[in-house]
Amino acid sequence: VASKRQRDDFSESELTVHPQQDHAAGPTAVAVSMKRALERMGPARTARTLAKLNQAEGFDCMSCAWPDPDPGHRHAAEFCENGAKAVAEEATTDRATPEFFAEHSIADLDSHSEYWLGQQGRITHPMIKRSGATHYVPIDWDDAFRLIAAELTGLGSQDEATFYTSGRASNEAAFVYQLFVRAFGTNNLPDCSNMCHESTSIALQESIGIGKASVTLDDVHAAKLIVIAGQNPGTNHPRMLSALEVAKQNGAKIISINPLREAGLVRFKNPQKPKGVIGHGTALSDLHLPIRLNGDLALFQALGSLLVEWDALDHGFISDYTTGFEEWKQHVKGLNWDEVGQSTGLTRDQIVEAARMLQASDRTVFCWAMGLTQHRNGVATIKEVVNLALAQGNIGKPGAGLLPVRGHSNVQGDRTMGIWERPAASFLDALQKEFGFDPPRENGHDVVDSIRAMRDGRVSIFVGLGGNFVQATPDTDVTMKALRGTRLTVQISTKLNRSHLVCGDTALILPTKGRTEKDIQASGAQYISVEDSVCSVHASRGPLEPASPHLRSEVSILTSIAEATLGERHGINWRSMRDDY
């Protein structure tokens, strides 16, 4: 393994503006992917990792939650430029060793950009910043666990600690984490989904009874119409472009709804096909609606109004499976079209064209992401998407349904495993039945509540399972001040980030294994699992030796913290969970 190389920091002065692109991917994406992979990993590690990325016997990509094709239908290179870069960042040969931390004070590190911090490589040892210290220094694993346990058990109330989860944590780690936190005695389990698809989860739960997608990848391929609102797959979910290409080849139409005309929704040059290398690729969007910011609610109601006017409805489905249709019908019939135009920035002709495409389709898939969720009325907007699907019976049948496209690779799985500050009573009852303790029943802190509680001195311990809390959360200045006011911060991480530097009076960095690495426990080789955007759960096994012999897996770290904190309380066998998961 190469020693850590000092890298130049990122400079915004080097940014340039180029003409807008008219396509995504192509040979350039391959060249950039390979360049980054070879620079960060070298030829041998590049070959070993990328050949296993998103393969049935390999490891799951950490860059997004787009689903994998069924085994037997996957390409040899089943990854995108983003995925190759994410793997290169984790499987880098650079290392952030104790010598690195001795050389750089926390203030020095904090003066660098987030990009530079990540370029310093994998953290090799557990590290601690003691009260009043200027540098991180190594700490023994057992000493770290004892310190955490002493701080947690010394709290006046269990609710004075909060336990954050990033969507890259595995199902196994997430389950152990929430079990420990609830056995400890709190539901303070904020996670990254609080800041992205929380409005989706609420809207879908309140309308169709489950806060997840209702489609599979095959449904996307079989759709006659795909509506993509507030989402840019070319940048955020590039492998989705392959699915859209298949749908187009099968005759699908695509409507894109976004203020910007994103290159990835104009044309896709698939680098694994000749026409994507030397040809023009595949045209994607048939209609682009350049909507005003947050005009989506008005647009979806206007589309519903036209479908009602034309009686382009599935009355049998409405009668058998829905409630509240008449109220919705009367509401959309009474829309003021001048207000619709002001809200959407679209002409009536543009909206009519989109509605005619909906009218002509009996198999429609609706996709969306942050462009819909990140508004005060996000829940209401997403419910209008659901209303369109229900009005035409486009749910619960092949080639049709709802597809909230998730970002973090296991953000959906973490919620399934119980990472939620507002758990259902049925879930808590199941925990009680299985493990013999009565979990706390009061709702805990979400992300914003956690920030406020730290700011106000009501939370003094922060534990982060992955992620970069400081950079991911709203109101950065307030978040920084809140974290710096805590007594202890604990970060379970693979690489250096800002949240290690904006920390509590005492701070711990607990380095963990990544997706690309082998995981050997007492019972032998382990694998983890993740859940993608279409609710498919699959295994992940890394091919590489760990970046350092001092690393521990997420599950190992969490069960060790639980053992040190709870001992034999509740009779939960943490060791058995650690030895074989």
Residue ranges: model-predicted function:
Residues V1-F59, C64:
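Intrinsically disordered, low-structural-confidence terminal and linker regions
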Residues A2-V30, G121-S409, M417, L431-Y581:
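Cofactor-pocket helix-loop regions in the catalytic cores of large enzyme subunits
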Residues C61-C64, C80, C196:
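Disulfide-bonded cysteines in secreted/extracellular proteins and peptides
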Residues S63-W66, G467:
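Short Cys/His-rich local motifs and their 1-3 flanking residues in nucleic-acid-associated proteins
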Residues P67-V87:
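Iron-sulfur (Fe-S) cluster-binding segments and ferredoxin-like electron-carrier domains
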Residues A86-H135, F145:
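Low-complexity, highly charged intrinsically disordered N-terminal segments
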Residues G418-R422:
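Surface-exposed loop and adjacent secondary-structure segments within mature catalytic domains
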Residues L428:
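Acidic, glycine-rich segments within the central catalytic cores of soluble metabolic enzymes
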